[in-house]
Amino acid sequence: MATTLGFKDIVDVPKWRMEAPALAASGAGMALAWDNRNSDVSGNPYIYLLRSASALDYFDPTTGEWGALATPGLAGTFGAGATAVFHPSQGPRGTLAAGGTTTSVVLSTALPAPVGVNQLANRGDGTGFRILVANKVTGKCEIRTIVGNTAGTTPTVYIDSAVPFTAAPNASDLYEIRAGRVFMLSAGTLAAGVWKYYDIATNSYSGNLATTNLPATIGSDSNAVALSESYVSNDRKPNEGFVSGGATWDAGSGAISKNCIQATAASSTTLTGSGMPASLQANEYRNFQVRIVEDTTTPTAVGQRSRIASHTGGATGVFTVAAFGVTPSAVAKFVVENDDDKILLRSSSSTSVFCYNITANTWDVTTFSAAGAACGAGVVVEQAFGPVRDVIGNHRHSFIYNFRGGGSASIDVLDIAGGANGSWSADIAYANKSQTFGTGTCGSYAPATFDGRFIHLNINGTQRMARFDVRNRRLDAGAYLRFPQGTALVGQKMAVTTFIDGATKLDFVYHLTNSQTQMLSMIVSR
């Protein structure tokens, strides 16, 4: 039976409800991390809590209960400055071995840890993880749901026979298990092991990731945003990108067909699109990426990603990109998405934008220019990717809102497409500007409902809540928390999950109270 919502203002005032208590009281630097994909097909159901250097927990919104995971073994002195962020389109990647069929693949590149029988067929809600295969013979990318697997590090992975691949995969074709990873940052003096990830598909941790160019001492407060290619506006599906086109990809029997852009010309560094919005503005998606999702003329080009250096506007815009390893054909199909290889971090009372390059495993402070003012305790960073594309251009998917914190009412906006290194709008004007944000302030972005307009905020670790409209730049009062808070602490203590039933979507906001174990949730009914 379809879910029908009929919330009425004033009658249906949003209210907080109790969930199961966390496994320990919240402390400084604790951080919730969650999947913001607007899809029940792709999304991970859990909310993760980095509780300490030795504790990572998960919360299951479908049961309202917590569970503990193995220790991440982070280095440093866990506390103020620690944080975590979920990157939904990361996960094990590599090549396939021979022996694939239209309903199975055999991995060649080993998983980071062995999996048990059928472990990949249940992500936590009874649905399997999604696997993308880039077939270098047919030139097609296809995404399917895993329904079974053998054990080990190079298992045979089975997909639903009702939704087969259009052709059997081949040896050396590419695979990506798009289960997501939780990236975790500890605090204190910089040391090897303060930055790691948890790989969800294999229930394993990375080794020590690079830390060069991070602050010498990680402290004060931190917040990060993952530029996932799976994050799209609320009117589009993951893997369709932000820019509509006149073509489709992955349209096999029973598959979920996806919109894309049809190229009309290509070189090693350019792609000319067609059927795009006439209102597309020049460089609106600079510093995003193009991804080749189908190329039946040059099949070895499929699956490639390339960062956009610039592009012209209009329905037939030309994208200038970093050189492809294999030049796509003039009839390739592509999508325009976030640069999936990036995580952006604000931290430690710095003006820098710390940029983590996932493939290279490097940090830099030069990809994006520094802010005009340092962040402080209560910093909140969110990319406003959810609203339907604004044809006027007043709102852009390239906007990253930075609540400065440190006792300031200032919100700074980084436009990652605003120049070769982005551009900043400092201390923007917004309606109802007065409230200051300090220790205890935290937030979570809800991109799937109400046109993806709202960042939900807990104010300074108190019982007061607010929400910020990213499209219309307005701060409004949120639903009051009728439960006393403990001592305010820095850390990411807000999260979002989305209930999806067909076309019906409903966001739930979660809050872990300060210096306490209480977890509460609220239906976003308005």
Ranges and model annotations:
Residues 36, 50-54, 133-138, 185-191, ...:
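Short, flexible beta-strand-to-coil junctions
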Residues 488-526:
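Blade-level signature of beta-propeller repeat domains, shared across WD40, Kelch, NHL, RCC1
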Residues 69-78, 89-171, 178, 208-215, ...:
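Autoprocessing Asn-cyclization modules and mimics
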Residues 2-28, 55-91, 192-221, 225-227, ...:
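Trp- and S/T/G-rich repeat-edge/linker motifs of beta-rich repeat architectures
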Residues 45-50, 180-187, 233, 240-242, ...:
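Short beta-strand elements that form the blades of beta-propeller/WD-repeat-like
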Residues 28-43, 83-90, 223-256, 381-395, ...:
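Structural signature of eukaryotic scaffold interfaces centered on beta-propeller domains
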Residues 11-18, 90-95, 174-183, 254-264, ...:
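Short domain-boundary/entry signatures in modular proteins, especially
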Residues 31-34, 43-49, 126-134, 183-184, ...:
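Short hydrophobic/aromatic-rich beta-strand motifs
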